[in-house]
Amino acid sequence: MTGAARRPRKLKVMSASAFANTFAGNPLDRASDRRVDAAWMANRLAAPESLAVAMWNGRPLIEDAKSGGVQIAYLRAQMAGELSEGGERLLFMGLWKDVAVFALDIEGPADPADGPLAGLGRFEDLRSIALTLTAGDAAILATAKGVFEWRRRHRHCAVCGAASEPAEGGWKRICPSCNAEHFPRTDPVVIMLPVNGERCLLGRQAAWPKGVYSALAGFLEPGESIEEACARELSEEAGLKASAVRYHSTQPWPYPSSLMIGLIAQVEDGEAIPDQTELDEVRWFTRGEADALIRGELADARAPGAMAIAHQLIKAWANGG
């Protein structure tokens, strides 16, 4: 192969939610039923029309898009297979109509764009380029990054410690010693905007960039419902009591493996007191101030960037949601 593969056409994505955050909206058919068919997988990997996404140390191979921004620089899957160390570094991503799409995980200090992938694109940090990608490309890359991050952290069996082996297109690892099966993990996180009348509460940590305020958040614990986790986090971090919890949207967040569950939480009257562990400061914002915050018009405060679900929660409430 002498150049990057042609780019597939855009697929219209149907979602159960009216709102899709950055990294949501993967346009591929995951075709999970095909993962167990090793012969089918090998056939598709060898097919000349099959494509592959390449990632080096978590950074995707991208190229400039003619319409502006950047896009995935697809490889031929055959080439990815040749670089995959016998399949250890391959992931079957799914189907684009009848075209199989794989992902290749490359590790090491040497930039492959200066070696075997020279002239095919460049590797850049996913978080830095996320908003310059199409929603579909960002979601595809987030999926690959999330699975590869899991693979790096779970190369050995959690039961007996033996080195595990990939199976089912990279979506499972099996221990050859005790036969334990391991699957990619997803850690649910509740992230909520506390609201009391015409004001919302945001918090900040001293380690954050100066002036940045964000929604409150915390990991869901075993045995908790989403609503219970939201109420617990509000009580722990800000001393507030939730009276009602409303779902907004979710966001896959592959750093390394979170699913952000966005909520609007009605809270009872009371003094908001930061716990000084998770939050160093909390501050109430009126609806007008929240709108100005999102627009970057407050002199002493800033919102998280638009790719963050916290930004979208604040924006939705400021706009009357």
Where are these regions (language model features)?
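Surface-exposed, charge/polar-rich loops and edge strands
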Residues: 224
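Hydrophobic alpha-helical positions that pack around
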Residues: 216, 230, 234
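Nudix hydrolase/Nudix homology domain
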Residues: 3-154, 165, 209-213, 275-321
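N-terminal strand-loop-strand
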Residues: 173-215, 219, 241-242
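Short, well-structured beta-strand/strand-turn elements
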Residues: 165-168, 239-248
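Active-site-adjacent beta-strand/loop module that shapes the phosphate/pyrophosphate-binding cleft
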Residues: 251-274
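Cys/His-rich short segments
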Residues: 143-193
